[in-house]
Regions:
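Secondary-structure junction motif
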Residues: 200-222, 290-291, 308-316
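Central regulatory/effector-binding core of bacterial HTH transcription factors
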Residues: 102-165
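Hydrophobic hinge/microswitch elements
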Residues: 140-145, 149-153, 158-159, 222-269
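Short helix-boundary/capping micro-motifs
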Residues: 22-40
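Alpha-helical linker/hinge and terminal dimerization helices associated
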Residues: 17, 54-55, 76-98, 160, ...
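Flexible hinge/capping segments at coil-to-helix
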Residues: 168-205
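A short LG(V/I)-centered, amphipathic sequence patch enriched
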Residues: 52-71
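A late-sequence structural motif
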Residues: 117, 269-311, 315-318
Length: 323
């Protein structure tokens, strides 16, 4: 028996109430759900009421002018995400056409990867799978792992370690975190004493970059509390802007400073005995390997990353300043 596209569309229609519920639950807004689903707000309300009647429970509390999930609603939302992922995988398995992917790729990506590496991956991947819809979430490493554990994403790319037993990680690319400074400060090489006398700009707690930098500094005999001053910032772009403004020095991914190095706005500072490296990681739930869109993206990322690393090394050697 073959399953036609029409059959699959009918299956989607039968689950429409659950899709409406999932959209309201993700945004905690009937108005936003109506906009995203191209429905009127009363139509969304009608679908939710019908689902509540079918299940015999209240799914949302709308008192006080705010929409919140009830205990039963939170349970259903968790399973609604799982059901959506399974439906997407079924469609990809049964739709005709070799290599054709459809449905939704729910992808969680930590901040630095999302800004500087992901566009190079997605451009090629989505061109190969034009029927695929992308649902992209970004945040720091801890946030992405939590999205994975709550089934809001089916696969993730993170910058720091994930210690939860429910997830597994695979290294797909090496990254080097470099210390940057404003060129006119003439910091080409820093002694340990001069580094400690500088203001250090770091990412917030929960960031993979923050974890890796702290661990590398400690291995080299440094403690954050030993620095003259430490300023926490919530993004790589904020660190770069602060360094350009002369507020201090900071560690950022080598992927994040191509343009600034070429333009002479920033320079890389060497610190004796200090090299900060990490692996970018593909993260997924423990159990069967990801399949469908998530599995295809995992395989693509693991393969494509090799080419990106080679491109970066070639660019770095071409742009390396003569000393």
């Amino acid at each position: 028996m073959t399953l036609s596209v029409d059959n699959l569309l009918m299956a989607q229609l039968e689950n429409f109430r659950l899709k409406v519920f999932r959209t309201v639950g993700e945004h905690l807004s009937f108005r936003k759900a109506a906009e995203l689903l191209f429905l009127t707000q009363p139509a969304v309300t009608l679908q939710i009421k019908a689902l509540e009647q079918d299940l015999g429970v209240r799914l949302f509390d709308r008192s006080g002018g705010h929409v919140t999930l009830t205990k039963e609603g939170a349970i259903l939302l968790r399973y609604a995400h799982k059901i959506a992922a399974i439906v997407s995988e079924v469609e990809q398995e049964l739709l005709p056409g070799e290599g054709q992917l459809s449905g939704i790729l729910a992808l969680g990506v930590s901040t630095t990867i999302a800004q500087y590496v992901l566009p190079r991956l997605l451009g090629v991947f989505l061109a190969e799978h034009a029927r695929l819809q992308l649902s992209l979430h970004s945040g720091n490493t801890d946030a992405i792992v939590q999205l994975l554990l709550s089934d809001k994403v089916s696969i993730g790319l993170i910058e720091g370690p994930a210690r939860q037993r429910e997830v597994r990680t695979e290294a797909f690319m090496e990254d080097r975190l470099v210390l940057i400074a404003r060129p006119d400060l003439e910091f080409r090489r820093l002694s340990h004493d001069r580094l400690l006398a500088s203001t250090l700009l770091v990412r917030e707690y929960g960031s993979g970059s923050r974890h890796v930098v702290e661990a590398a500094l400690e291995n080299a005999g440094f403690k954050l509390k030993s620095f003259k001053n430490v300023i926490e910032l919530d993004s790589t772009e904020a660190i770069k802007s602060a360094v350009e403004a002369g507020l201090g020095v900071g560690f950022v991914s080598c992927w994040a400073i191509h343009k600034e190095i070429e333009l002479g706005a920033l320079e890389v500072v060497e610190v004796e005995g200090l090299r900060v490296t990490r692996n970018y990681l593909v993260v997924s739930r423990v159990g069967p390997e990801p399949s469908g869109a998530a599995g295809a993206f995992r395989s693509f990322a693991l393969d494509r990353a090799k080419h990106l690393s080679e491109q970066y090394e070639n660019t770095r050697h071409r742009n390396a300043p003569s000393r």
